[in-house]
Amino acid sequence: MENERVARALINGMASVIRGKQDFIENFIITVLARGHLLLEDFPGLGKTTAAKTFARLISDSEGSVLTFKRIQFTPDLLPYDITGVDIFDTESRSFRFVPGPIFANIVLADEINRTTPKVQSALLEVMAEGQVTVGNVTRRPADPFMVIATQNPVESEGIFPLPVAELDRFMMRLSLGYPEREAELSVLNENPSERLLPLVKPIVTTQDLRSAQDATDEIFCHPDLKGAIADIVRSTRTAKGVVLGASPRAG
């Protein structure tokens, strides 16, 4: 499948469930093609989980199976190994056996990520930045493709742990679905997308198609003048009044 058709197919596939949010969907797919991670900051019930599940169902592997999807509900009592996995001693073989955690899924939904402690939040840093998971003395690769979609409620102020700058820097975009327009909200009432439309979503793109489209983004020509303008914008955030901490070079 041509790379442009891959992007269009994914956009149309998500639009079949997520109604009236074209800008959100396009930015979602841009992040996917750039191999980035997403932070969704929005109120409950606006479709964050549905969006993540829909995307996972649109892509199949070489055997026709959809991408694996895991949802991690972040709570104050969550532990790092609940995310990464743990080595368990097998009494029969008298050796340690690794039990992988949900971070080894293709699409990982980190739900309400700011409700757990910084120690647990940091369990995501290595895999998001370096594409690897270290448990004990062994380093393992996550699934391919791999993406973290984290959510947080923008109005909560009690019982939360704001994301540290180091972790915020791992997300390519921070998006908000927002409330739908009246017609789109009526469509949600009539169709109940998460229960009626989501099960109907079938794979329309293979992992090979997705990798090809992702590789193509690395070949896009960017004029030196445009790169210079991007660098100037990023650098200006570090001296702008009212900005506590400017953007890192990663933002470019």
Where are these regions (language model features)?
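Pre-Walker A (pre-P-loop) alpha-helix and adjacent loop at the N terminus of AAA/AAA+ ATPase modules
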Residues: 2-46, 235
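Conserved alpha-helical scaffold flanking the Walker A/P-loop in AAA+ ATPase domains
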Residues: 27-30, 89-109
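Walker A/P-loop
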Residues: 32-75
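Walker B catalytic acidic pair
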Residues: 42, 111-112, 123
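P-loop (Walker A) phosphate-binding loop of NTP-binding proteins
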Residues: 43, 83, 151
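Conserved NTP-binding/hydrolysis module of P-loop NTPases
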Residues: 75-94
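Canonical AAA+ ATPase core
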Residues: 90-94, 116, 120, 128-220
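C-terminal helical "lid" subdomain and adjoining coupling/linker elements of P-loop NTPases
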Residues: 221, 237-252
